[in-house]
Amino acid sequence: MSLKLGVIGTGAIGRDHIRRCSQTLLNSQVVAVTDINLEQAAKVVADLKLDAEVYPDGHALINSPQVEAVLVTSWGPSHEEFVLAAIAAGKPVFCEKPLAVTAEGCRRIVDAEVAYGKRLVQVGFMRPYDEGYRALKAVIDSGQIGEPLMLHCAHRNPTVGENYKTDMAITDTLIHELDVLRWLLNDDYVSVQVVFPRKSSKALAHLRDPQIVLLETAKGTRIDVEVFVNCQYGYDIQCEVVGETGIAKLPEPSQVQLRSGAKLSNAILMDWKDRFIGAYDVELQAFIDSVRAGQVGGPSAWDGFAAAVAADACIEAQGSEQIVKMSLPDRPRFYG
């Protein structure tokens, strides 16, 4: 039997997930949608030829007996409300990042899930489902390069819109590294410093770009992440792990190598959706499969909380350009 899904939010990522769950993935059926713009929700249903009902709001959708699991892809500040409602209804919920817009909101979700007594929440961090990151983690975990000592990373976008602000380099961009690097290293952060190199002439007046984020983990690993969102040349994700006895590097996406016009070249992707489309498919299929098996897995509410705590420290460090300490409370045994 297909898992009956309700989707809250039919913007770009919501529409893409609805398409994915109704046309690409196995054992799922989108039976309910809603959005703050109900006309947009109805248009998505019509465009994708869904046999789905448009609900007046997220709470009506969550509490519908037709809905077995919920996808939250709405405006970020609404996420906490709908995730808490799904937990209260006892329904599994996949929530796109951010889990909540504050660390306190994430902690409320953690507390609600622990009180319920069963994992219901998966957070939409997709990089742990990327083949390249999985291969990199396998090398680290094997001990082939010894203990990781340093990581050199970069997150580069060709351009960003006028509404992109300096702190969004953390909350919208670096947040993916904050999650995936914890997962790669099985380690937590203890401090961060943000420094600003010479500003790019391609950056808008209100935006400080690029930025360099310097992280330290509890085990002493040092991480530098270059965030450069106006690099012009493409969407480029880099991660190099320097170990005691070797170096492991995130593989580049598979592209045709071209020999032409006295040049040897490889194309660089321009869009994040193209770079991680496979990871999005694997991520949501894993959610569907785990719900059908009776136990939600993947990035947890605790992972969402940990990322939010780190992001708050990074934003503080942006303002001071000094080293900012951070720490997490003890992880509930509930999360393993």
UniProtKB/Swiss-Prot annotation:
GO terms for biological process: inositol catabolic process. Transmembrane segments: none annotated. Keywords: NAD, Oxidoreductase. Its EC number is 1.1.1.18. It catalyses: myo-inositol + NAD(+) = scyllo-inosose + NADH + H(+). InterPro entries: Gfo-Idh-MocA_inositol_DH, Gfo/Idh/MocA-like_OxRdtase_C, Gfo/Idh/MocA-like_OxRdtase_N, MI/DCI_dehydrogenase, NAD(P)-bd_dom_sf. It comes from the Bacteria. PANTHER family: INOSITOL 2-DEHYDROGENASE, PTHR43593. Homotetramer. This is Inositol 2-dehydrogenase.
